[in-house]
């Protein structure tokens, strides 16, 4: 017997599918009490039939029993509930989100179930049974289904079902179902929106007619991108956001520059005419000496009104699609962090946010996209949520979507990262603004990524010289006859009585007059020598001047004591503790400082001088080779501690993070961070230098050339473990030849060091130039086996005195200048191998006839110092370059012309090393050892004459 208890109502928490399930179980219970779960059986016995909380007709709150006896058909309720869920989950398949196509999929999922229901039955079911949040004017299940179809299957469509967090999912559904996003716009705002669209279209058409055939990568077809960005920036500014960072490719970029970032039309036109026009002092992000095409340039601009303003930054961008994404994320993280205190920086993600504008072909096609998405929830890289916009013109150059992705939507990749997706028809301006509003509100509330798929078309070809009808003839017949979004919206406003035809025409004429007036300000093309051949700035051409980077020994000892201290009760791993304790006497008179300690001393001293540090890499906290131990782990609690957070007299942050297994996205992020935080020593460390080449696009397009193209300064440090130790082709070479090939115009420093002191000094030198015009990136081929090698360890006095030396001479050689016949130039580990062989005394060499110079700084080459060394040896006969890399790799092809010039006509110049190879290294450690020994023997044997050696070692002479 059922005993109904009216004191409480446990059914209040059940609604939608859950309520349907409970009703179904109650039906089974009434047939057979033992057929349901014991817990449900107890509920039914105690509280009776499930109830709902609404009156069918009035919508008033009123508890009503809902049992099989009162409904007559449980299946009808369950089917109605399922229809509602299908609308939410699959409504996007029926939505009209592509302006060039009618919806043709998805109807079956909803309509099939609807055919099993009839209107009479649906009208008998209260709306709140199937839709608990139904507004009061929605009374029945039939009303609910019609209303929800309006929400989910029109110009806006949503994909939320994959969101794992129920709170987020509920909020998203409530936002779109409450219609708060689609509140009617005021006539004033609708008129302003039409004016904006008129400006965008007018600008593009003016360019099309005035600069015929010039590339501009028109926005036409997704014109609403500009108002969408406007809306997001305005709403962000109202919420107190100080910085909005935008990354986008070239499609639509000129219109975004002109309208969102307020770059004057006259400046845009001047770039088309190759004219020089007075700067507005807000284009500092693209003032390089080689320059770049107009649709790659960025800009920074403060926008808003007198009461609410925010800084908007559009990042400079190459044509390597999507590689700007992690760079802009780095901008945002730098803008969010306070680096003026010891410890990790304090992050406030409400200070800035990122908008990334993607292409529909590039978003699923470029791996850097997923690498960057993976950063979004990681402690070291998250920026509190990014708003993604796919400017979806449904084509990639000439490639249709069915040839460019394996999924229905270009946005599908985002589902794997728990990102809500909003599809919107780019021909429905007000729907686009609703999507923008939802995106910014979601980001501000949940601090997570969200994506808008802005679906339009491309009115012209990939560029304006391309005829798209050659490859997409049918589509472009449609597009040719398709009205623009401005025309569509103008007709809508006229039809609704918001504007008259004359008022619409006045708006159009105003735009045209404004464009003509701006064009009239542009002078003729500037063909002067100064305009065509812009010189490298003197401060760059001069290079880095010598800087005293030594520190008093007492200061170093005090720092070292702090580095070897940890909180009382902190349990350091015994093996690590032993390693650290060995460092305690390193600065004594008879002690030696190994590489890792020199690094820690440099870091600590840099922090004490007020420079923040950020170090990331796949194993950077411990160090790939278990050398660094800059973050300690308590063996009992797993808590972490970094001594660099507790040293005295530090007022700058130190952040060290283990990165995800990514090179490209992480390098891009660190580069962007450094550009936006130029006072910070930002360092990226490869696990092995061999893996750095997966970030090659970042090295090529940003790190090496960003300043020349855009005037974008960076002091990023790349730490690339390099050295041949018989570990095979994937763990030997950071490919220094590639960094040297990119070296020009003093764009960066490339170093391959041979002592801990040199590492100490070059880090301190790099820190000293941050935030100055002399700054440039630093690329270091860091050691592996040499980290603990006695010949790379340094005395305390070598750290306390002097500065970084771009070239070093081998001690105890060259002491009899008149006898020296052979001068060896080498770098990095090869120099230590030669020194170790000499010190071992295993073989007899005529060392009086030999001298060795270590080139510590490969670029810029220390020519003056090397020339002074050569001049000392009056009887010199030959200059030799010795390396362990194959001849077509390493530094030889960079060094050869330098050495030939230094040698002149009187000296022979030669190469000793491995022959040309397609792979950096062999895989057999025994063969490696034999080759290495042969290189060393030939180099140190001054009687060895130049020839092609039969034992796989290349010896070459001019």
Swiss-Prot record:
Q: What is this protein called?
A: 2-oxoglutarate dehydrogenase E1 component
Which principal EC class is assigned to this enzyme? Answer: oxidoreductase
The family classification in the record reads: Belongs to the alpha-ketoglutarate dehydrogenase family.
- Assembly description: Homodimer. Part of the 2-oxoglutarate dehydrogenase (OGDH) complex composed of E1 (2-oxoglutarate dehydrogenase), E2 (dihydrolipoamide succinyltransferase) and E3 (dihydrolipoamide dehydrogenase); the complex contains multiple copies of the three enzymatic components (E1, E2 and E3).
Which transformation does this protein catalyse, written as a reaction?
A: N(6)-[(R)-lipoyl]-L-lysyl-[protein] + 2-oxoglutarate + H(+) = N(6)-[(R)-S(8)-succinyldihydrolipoyl]-L-lysyl-[protein] + CO2
Annotated Gene Ontology cellular component terms: cytosol; oxoglutarate dehydrogenase complex
- Taxonomy-wise, where does this protein's organism fall, top ranks first? Bacteria, Bacillati, Bacillota, Bacilli, Bacillales
**GO molecular function terms attached to this record:** oxoglutarate dehydrogenase (succinyl-transferring) activity; thiamine pyrophosphate binding
Q: Which CDD domains match?
A: TPP_E1_OGDC_like
Q: What is its EC number?
A: 1.2.4.2
HAMAP family per UniProt: SucA_OdhA
Q: Which cofactor does it need?
A: thiamine diphosphate
Keyword Oxidoreductase on entry: yes
InterPro entries from the entry? 2oxoglutarate_DH_E1 (IPR011603), 2oxoglutarate_DH_E1_bac (IPR023784), DH_E1 (IPR001017), KGD_C_sf (IPR042179), ODO-1/KGD_C (IPR031717), THDP-binding (IPR029061), Transketolase-like_Pyr-bd (IPR005475)
Role this protein plays: E1 component of the 2-oxoglutarate dehydrogenase (OGDH) complex which catalyzes the decarboxylation of 2-oxoglutarate, the first step in the conversion of 2-oxoglutarate to succinyl-CoA and CO(2).
| Record's keyword terms, sorted | Glycolysis, Oxidoreductase, Thiamine pyrophosphate
UniProt record, GO biological process: glycolytic process; tricarboxylic acid cycle
């Amino acid at each position: 017997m059922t005993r109904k208890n009216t004191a409480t109502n446990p059914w209040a928490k059940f609604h939608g599918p859950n309520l349907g399930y409970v009703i179904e179980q109650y039906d089974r219970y009434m047939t057979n009490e033992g057929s349901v779960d014991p817990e449900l059986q107890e509920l039914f016995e105690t509280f009776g039939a499930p109830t709902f909380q609404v009156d069918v007709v009035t919508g008033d709150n009123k508890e009503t029993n809902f049992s099989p006896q009162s409904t007559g058909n449980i299946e009808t309720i369950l089917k109605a509930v399922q229809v509602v869920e299908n609308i939410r989950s699959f409504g996007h398949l029926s939505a009209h989100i592509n302006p060039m196509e009618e919806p043709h999929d998805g109807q079956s999922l909803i309509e099939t179930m609807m055919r099993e229901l009839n209107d009479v039955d649906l009208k008998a079911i209260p709306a709140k049974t199937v839709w608990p949040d139904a507004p009061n004017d929605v009374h029945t299940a039939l009303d609910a289904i019609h209303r929800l179809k309006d929400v989910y299957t029109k110009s806006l469509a949503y994909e939320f079902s994959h969101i794992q967090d129920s709170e987020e999912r509920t909020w998203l559904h409530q936002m779109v179902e409450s219609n708060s996003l689609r509140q009617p716009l005021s006539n004033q705002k609708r008129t302003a929106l039409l004016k904006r669209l008129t400006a965008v279209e007018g600008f593009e058409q003016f360019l099309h007619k005035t600069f015929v055939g010039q590339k501009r990568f028109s926005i036409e077809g997704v014109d609403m991108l500009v108002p969408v960005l406007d809306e997001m920036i305005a709403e962000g500014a109202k919420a107190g956001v100080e910085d909005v960072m935008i990354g986008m490719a070239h499609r639509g970029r000129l219109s975004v520059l002109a309208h969102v970032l307020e770059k004057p039309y006259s400046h845009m036109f001047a770039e088309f005419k190759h004219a020089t026009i007075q700067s507005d002092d807000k284009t500092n992000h693209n003032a390089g000496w080689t320059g770049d095409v107009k649709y790659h340039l960025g800009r920074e601009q403060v926008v808003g009104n007198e009461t609410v303003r925010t800084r908007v930054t559009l990042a400079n961008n190459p044509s390597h699609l999507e590689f700007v994404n992690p760079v802009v994320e780095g901008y945002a993280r730098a803008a969010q962090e306070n680096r003026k205190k010891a410890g990790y920086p304090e992050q406030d993600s409400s200070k800035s946010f990122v908008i990334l504008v993607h292409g529909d072909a590039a978003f699923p096609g470029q791996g850097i996209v997923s690498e960057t998405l993976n950063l979004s929830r990681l402690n070291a890289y998250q920026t509190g949520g990014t708003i993604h916009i796919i400017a979806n013109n449904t084509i990639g150059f000439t490639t249709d979507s069915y040839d460019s992705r394996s999924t229905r939507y270009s946005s599908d990749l985002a589902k794997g990262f728990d990102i809500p997706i909003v599809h919107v028809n780019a021909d429905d301006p007000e729907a686009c603004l609703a999507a923008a509003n939802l995106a910014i509100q979601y980001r501000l509330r949940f601090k997570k990524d969200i994506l808008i798929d802005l679906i339009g078309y491309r009115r012209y070809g990939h560029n304006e010289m391309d005829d798209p009808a050659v490859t997409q003839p049918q589509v472009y017949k449609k597009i040719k006859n398709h009205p623009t979004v401005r025309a569509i919206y103008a007709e809508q406003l006229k039809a609704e009585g918001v504007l008259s035809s004359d008022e619409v025409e006045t708006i159009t004429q105003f735009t045209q007059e404004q464009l003509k007036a701006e064009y009239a300000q542009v002078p003729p093309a500037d063909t002067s020598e100064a305009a065509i051949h812009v010189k490298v700035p003197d401060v760059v051409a001069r290079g880095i001047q010598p800087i005293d980077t030594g520190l008093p020994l007492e200061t170093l000892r005090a720092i070292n004591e702090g580095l070897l201290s940890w909180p009382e009760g902190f349990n350091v791993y015994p093996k690590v503790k032993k390693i650290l304790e060995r460092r305690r006497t390193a600065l004594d008179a008879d002690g030696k400082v190994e590489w890792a300690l020199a690094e820690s001393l440099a870091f600590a001293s840099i922090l004490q001088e007020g420079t923040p540090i950020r170090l990331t890499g796949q194993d950077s906290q411990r160090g790939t080779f278990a050398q660094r131990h800059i973050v300690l782990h308590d063996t009992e609690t797993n808590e972490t501690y970094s001594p660099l957070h507790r040293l005295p007299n530090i007022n700058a942050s130190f952040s060290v993070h283990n990165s995800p297994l990514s090179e490209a996205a992480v390098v891009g992020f660190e580069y962007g961070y450094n550009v936006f935080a130029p006072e910070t020593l930002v360092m990226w460390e490869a696990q092995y230098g061999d893996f750095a080449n997966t970030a090659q696009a970042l090295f090529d397009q940003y790190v090496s050339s960003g300043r020349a193209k855009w005037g974008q300064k960076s002091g990023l440090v790349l730490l690339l473990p390099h050295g041949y130790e018989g570990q095979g082709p994937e763990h030997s070479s950071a490919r220094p030849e590639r960094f040297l090939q990119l070296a020009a115009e003093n764009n960066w420093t490339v170093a391959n060091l041979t002592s801990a002191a040199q590492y100490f000094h070059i880090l301190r030198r790099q820190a000293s130039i941050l935030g100055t015009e002399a700054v440039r990136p630093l690329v270091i081929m860091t050691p592996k086996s040499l980290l603990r090698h006695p010949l790379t360890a340094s005395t305390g006095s070598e750290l306390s005195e002097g500065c970084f030396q771009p070239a070093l001479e081998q001690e105890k050689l060259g002491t009899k200048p008149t006898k020296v016949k052979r001068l060896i130039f080498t770098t990095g580990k090869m120099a230590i191998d030669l020194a170790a062989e000499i010190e071992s005394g295993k073989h007899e060499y005529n060392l009086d006839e030999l001298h060795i110079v270590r080139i510590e700084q490969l670029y810029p080459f220390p020519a003056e110092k090397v020339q002074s060394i050569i001049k000392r040896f009056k009887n010199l006969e030959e200059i030799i370059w010795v390396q362990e890399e194959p001849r077509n790799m390493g530094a030889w092809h960079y060094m050869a012309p330098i050495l030939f010039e230094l040698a002149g006509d009187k000296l022979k110049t030669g190469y000793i090393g491995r022959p040309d190879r397609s792979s950096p290294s062999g895989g057999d450690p025994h063969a490696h050892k034999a080759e290495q020994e042969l290189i060393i023997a030939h180099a140190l044997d001054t009687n060895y004459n130049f020839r092609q050696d039969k034992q796989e070692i290349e010896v070459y002479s001019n």
